[in-house]
Amino acid sequence: MDDQIILKHVTKRFTTKTLGTVTAVNDFNLSIKEGECFSFLGPSGCGKTTTLRMIAGFEDLSEGEIHLCGRPVSIKSQNLYVPPEHRGLGMVFQAFAVWPHMNVFENVAFPLTIKKVPKDEIVKRVNEAL
């Protein structure tokens, strides 16, 4: 099976007024194959959410590369950045709905709607996921 998510030397730094430059993720490498199940475990503040946000495209890398389904979506050294809506991912957030005016079904269906998946297929896939 091919690698579906690849992170190469991914680093994320933030600059704050009080602490200066803080490294949230440092030289992280990851390869996830199709069908694999995985989770990020670690204490608060260790970079789990930041890593997921970089994969989804909500945070830019400070260094490194991210590839999804065989195509590069973020390569800092080449100034390559594919926005979240063009990465082919959906994300369920841990705190509240992404769109509070939508119910759970509508929130889960939204990425499929954006991709213009037929309505009957959306209903089938969302029901399977929930």
Roles of regions detected by a PLM:
Residues 1-4, 13-27, 78-79:
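A short, flexible loop at the N-terminus of ABC-type nucleotide-binding domains that lies
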Residues 41-43:
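The feature captures the beta-strand-to-loop junction immediately N-terminal to the Walker
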Residues 56:
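Helix-to-loop junction immediately C-terminal to a conserved catalytic motif
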Residues 64-76:
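Conserved ABC transporter NBD signature motif
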Residues 73-90, 114, 119-123:
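ABC ATPase NBD coupling module
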Residues 93, 104-113, 123, 127:
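Short helical segment in ABC ATPase nucleotide-binding domains corresponding to the A-loop/adjacent helical element
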